[in-house]
Amino acid sequence: TKSYSLTNTAGGRFAINRTTGALTVANSTLLNYEAATSHAVTVRVTDRGGLTYDETFTINLTNVNEAPSGTNATVTITEDTAHVLTAANFGFSDVDAGDALSAVRIDTLPTAGTLTLSGTAVTAGQVIMTADLAAGQLVFTPAADANGTGYARMTFSVRDSTSLYDPTPNTLTVNVTAVNDRPADLSLSANMVAEKATPIDPPRFRSRL
């Protein structure tokens, strides 16, 4: 009767069945192709008399396509000013070499203001291609005279060049900085004054700020 054991588990990544010698994955979270494409394990076989034999094997990993990640971000704009959103506003990272941002899906619309693509209102779930982002077609516009920190929030998911989406949506927050509006709409309380009138109740100008 023989028994099997591992004298080198590759840092806890692998285990072996003592009776059958079947090698299994002990901790899959430690298997990362981008960090290491192979690992060495050392198998020890022991016979009934207690004699042992050790041999080291190389376990090669197969790469799998992993989902990308976006980034929570904040954009600060000026009151009454439209802002063009670019790829940089959404962030993108992917552990797979060669994968790049291909699109952004708008999961929920801004809580205030409007979001348009080429002048047309964006709908929840709409996919915005990177070509449109590069062309400046995605535009956020706050409501007239509106401002404030955290004025609007929207959620989004980035997509890589293999059409995988980030499984966890991110949030884009828009801060709108107030500006001092110039006075407008002058009006006159009356446009006639009686001949030789005394200045008891002269006409007055009024302005809406």
Where are these regions (language model features)?
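Acidic, turn/loop-rich segments in luminal/extracellular domains of secretory-pathway
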Residues: 1-69, 74-186, 191-199, 204-209
